[in-house]
């Protein structure tokens, strides 16, 4: 059985190491409001410092679309990293070129530099071979520790690997592959999967893949309204994808055939006048079964919370991807936060599968009580679907 080579498997003392991180953090006026992605990269960086490597950090921030824009600069990240590492992190105001090469040539063992945003060049997202070669020129070894962009074949996530050797994963990517891979493919059973969010079309391939592995699948969020239509229920003005009714019906049938429990919300919180921008909902009520005309479903109801919580408590492994309702609005967050609380308090291996679920569990205050939180959004979903991730497939394997 082969596995991806990790930084633990190589000697990088005195070597220049190009580390692709995911420092795509929220920045406003030079201030970082959530540094969890920076913190997630620290174990890999600290290991390389201790090994005496010369560490060249690379990342994107936002979508500058190939233009140099000050608001997308990684300078604030360099400052934050210096604080966390208790040592200087030199910020370079470009990511390729002679001045960058000259600065890198002056590095001593244990030094850390951060390159400017790779997406200031459109060649990054084009996976341009010439641009990848210029990035690779800076180093000898490639470490990918950016799981959040592993599903993208970009110059700094995949292209550089053609020019550097060895190519290995950092601790963050290693953990992601272990939890989203091994622990969902060979889980301690029963495995309960909770899927929420807005669109069935985004998650249908994941549902299909997980029907092969799960003992119970719970559906919440706006996705559940499309499944309600598939079961012949009315959903009022709730968000749905009528074109996905056939695939929803097929998923329900496949679950029955496989003996997988497939739980949909028996009741919902519905509102009359949802205004997301203002964070208001107007009149609200609970509907069991059908939602009446003029009402919009925004969260799961108390009976759903009870049903879903029971399934979570009976599990040994829980994978959660996607909120139960519009958790950003206080009136509609009870379902999501109740599920977060149940997962936190249950005796389970809990895996939070990226994106909005991580945001929701952070807001709920239970983040420190879960086993593992994925840093990937789209990457987590594609990996759970069984797709090959370009940023992982370029790495060396070891048997």
Per-range role (PLM):
Residues 1-399:
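Active-site loop-to-helix "anion-binding N-cap" substructures in soluble metabolic enzymes
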